[in-house]
Amino acid sequence: MIESILSGAVRFRWLVLFLTAVVGAIGAWQLNLLPIDVTPDITNKQVQINTVVPTLSPVEVEKRVTYPIETAIAGLNGVENMRSLSRNGFSQVTVIFKESSNLYFMRQQVTERLAQARPNLPAGVEPQMGPVSTGLGEVFHYSVEYEFPDGKGAKVKDGEPGWQSDGSFLTERGERLTDRVSKLAYLRTVQDWIIRPQLRTTAGVADVDSLGGYVKQFVVEPDAAKMAAYGISFEELAQALEDANLSVGANFIRRSGESYLVRADARIKSADEIARAVIAQRQGVPITVGQVANINVGGELRSGAASRNGYETVVGSALMLVGANSRTVAQAVGDKLEEIKKTLPPGVVIVPTLNRSQLVMATIKTVAKNLVEGAALVVVILFALLGNWRAAVIAALVIPLSLLISAIGMNGLNISGNLMSLGALDFGLIIDGAVIIVENSLRRLAERQHHEGRLLTLKERLEEVILSSREMVRPTVYGQLVIFMVFLPCLTFQGVEGKMFSPMVITLMLALASAFVLSLTFVPAMVAVLLRKKVSEKEVRVIAVTKERYRPLLERAVARPMPFLGAALVTLALAAMAFTFVGREFMPTLDEQNLNLSSVRIPSTSIDQSVAIDLPLERAVLSLPEVQTVYSKAGTASLAADPMPPNASDNYIILKPKSEWPEGITTKEQVIERIREKTAPMVSNNYDVTQPIQMRFNELIGGVRSDVAVKIYGENLDDLASTAQKIAAVLRKTPGATDTRVPLTGGFPTFDIVFDRAAIARYGLTVKEVADTVAAAMAGRPSGQIFDGDRRYDIVIRLPGQQRENLDVLGALPVMLPAVEGQPRASVPLRQLVQFRFTQGLNEVSRDNGKRRVYVEANVGGRDLGSFVDDAAKRIAAEVKLPPGMYIEWGGQFQNLQAATQRLAIIVPLCFILIAATLYMAIGSAALTATVLTAVPLALAGGVFALVLRDIPFSISASVGFIAVSGVAVLNGLVLISAIRKRLEDGAAPNEAVIEGAMERVRPVLMTALVASLGFVPMAIATGTGAEVQKPLATVVIGGLITATVLTLFVLPAVCGMVLRRQKKLEKPGGELLEA
């Protein structure tokens, strides 16, 4: 069939060229539509269930909220893993599903299970599912702030919206903001009611998160003494506000034939109307809210805050919808914000702080630069070695055509163009088959022309093109099949590594398949069309000189093979020794151009104290000339996609372009060291320096933010905490450990209110009545809402901040006694019903699949991940004794490296068995098949030496390089063996067949090796964004092809000569060879 395709391509060459042009045009159109991203979407399918319960401690949250939800979700079909977090007043359960699951269907299933769990949850508690986004869904951050944060430099016109001469800020609605809380609450109002609703309409945006400022509230601050004097309870105050804030419909009336809708709108519209609301009557005199309480426009008891460049702000985050493209969504968000800016009130601005599309474009710029430079080098080599510009053009045209055809397949398979899918394309590797066919056609046309002594006729030329293509189609087909097979292991990857590398392998296979089809159709047709004139019989000088120097060495290798075999064995032994010194890591870290400084303080740190620490930290880091801006997110945002306690902050450090860095500062490691020096004097901090995407990536795959984690499982939290501290001490002593820390599960100061049940009973009260009074006074009780157009603000009853923190005031808090007819209602001080005491409680409780766990996390610097874990595991086993029932697991990126390595250990040998079987089918001799396979070890040896010389750890990226170079080595060996077998079939002696066959294949072997290796040179030496991910793969291929080429030209002929001579000795009397 293939021969028919070749003949048809030559005979109908103009039709083939026309169809190729059409397909190329379709490919160009598809390439323009190809979605662009940084890396493949590696996120797992998960659903977050967030539950806010302000009045419960971490242990109570675990017992009464987290556990019932986990129990309800357990057993749901498709659940792969489940982890949870219980903190003060907050529960988050993360359910991870199998990749084959339909996320929207699973969310429906979770909704049904949550309905089953609700009867087991505390009254009023409502679990909420997180947005339909991913762990890497935050594609755009922006800051909502005053154009002049403190009013300095602003144009002041009293009476007009903006800053006033007295330091206050006048809103467009005439509200005068005089204090810090009201100013920040105004920024939050702008974010929640102007920016967020518009931004949520952007295509590809799942939701918009808000953090910082204060959610505006109308706060009713009761005076406990006045309430006691009037005999009014907290419950009566709350009920009075709800009763005074009503809107009811009364159907309609008819008058003069017309219908009038009856409205009875008694909604409260302002703080003054709250003050005039009647609570009760005493002796016929109405008691209003204003008589027993102060009414202020204030803010929530917040759990999160944000700041930028040393000033408090509000930070918004656009969350990308699952399956959307980060570049297009981030660009759409940026464009939408530009429109929204026109609708902002005077004096308020939006400042973009993190835009994922900028990283995408910087990464793709690096990939495109490497592809163009690699293609240019390949074309130069083709021109230099073929010595015929027409032939070089034919081979070079396969490069853009294969890329365009691949784009059609990528769109069809929903693969984005990114660092992995496009970054591994080596056009030299892809066009190897085309180069072999073009080179053979060029050689045969020259030989036929020399034989005829004239220019060939059209018929002769076409016949020769068909014969030359047919001659090389067998090694080309089997060689391409072998290259396909060597990449099969990568398609067996699962989890994160599968999502990361499968698109790369599929794209490479699409390009190889495209080039292969073009080699059978387009290339013969173009050869028949372009190579019409006289073909030079003389080889280019480079090839001629190479052959001249090569022949005597080749003859020596065939005649005396043992020294060459000995050198090969020594090389393999040295490579095996060198590999023991090569480090291991899951994959190289992408340089995101920005940094993230995670700060953790002692558990008792309040959100306001965290902000007070963040502000000077931002100013200190901002003083570095290479830093463009610094912004911080402390605590938990409204959607709780990334919940943090009040004592933790993420400080995002946005760097300037490297061209603007100070002289002498060239690497990010130097910048990190300078940041550490700046933050070292800061007290009450534990810093972890990483990158925004890297941090979320680590957290996504292992539930932690660092490179590696030791997860400790058990039941007793005290034992878990003490064991974690011991392991952390061991890790800190292990070379390479940086930013080692143990999340503090305990040490959270707790103010306990202990009920005296006997006293409560003596006064005729119930525990609930006392508890409701405490909760309303301390935590606050919502008592309706005020509507302002589309906006709505809660009315909340709670004690003033200073009174809430004063034990004497709390002790004197009146608890109203049951009413006695005919007597004024009496009260009893709270201190007579309860006791106050301070204790140490838990900060958080974490669980994996229903099992309590604590972890120790660390980043790794100065050494590879694999050797660090090996070293640390030995030290922990020797120095830390685990209590009964407790066990540890290693998590983080090492977990993925381990899983991928174990899978490769099984799949790679199976693939090599398949390759050997394929070669045997192509060659028909077990001995010669084994001879070709000897190319693989020396190719791998070159890759190992290259990694050692460049001090690059072994990673999954490097393993793909080893796989690629193995395929090229086998292809070259197959091309050489095919030439030797042809001469044997023509009757040549073994030594003559080996020498002449090798001499004939010098040029194609050198060309395939050079174009494949030089195509990777730009990737190996690149320094742009994303280059670090490509370097291991490119380095391995270049180093491997150097040794593989030496093997193909010297060791392979030497081994082949030995095998053929042995077969000659075993020849039967009838001339048939015995199988060796």
Swiss-Prot record:
The keyword Transmembrane applies. It is found in: Cell membrane. GO terms for cellular component: plasma membrane. Keywords: Cadmium, Cadmium resistance, Cell membrane, Cobalt, Membrane, Nickel, Plasmid, Transmembrane, Transmembrane helix, Transport. The keyword Transport applies. Pfam families: ACR_tran. It comes from the Bacteria. It is a multi-pass membrane protein. One of its GO terms (biological process) is response to cadmium ion. The chain crosses the membrane at residues 14-34, 367-387, 391-411, 419-439, 476-496, 503-523, 562-582, 904-924, 929-949, 960-980, 1004-1024, 1036-1056. Component of the NCC cation-efflux system that confers resistance to nickel, cobalt and cadmium. May form a membrane tunnel, which allows ion transport across the membrane. Belongs to the resistance-nodulation-cell division (RND) (TC 2.A.6) family. This is Nickel-cobalt-cadmium resistance protein NccA. It comes from Alcaligenes xylosoxydans xylosoxydans (Achromobacter xylosoxidans). The lineage of its organism: Bacteria, Pseudomonadati, Pseudomonadota, Betaproteobacteria, Burkholderiales.
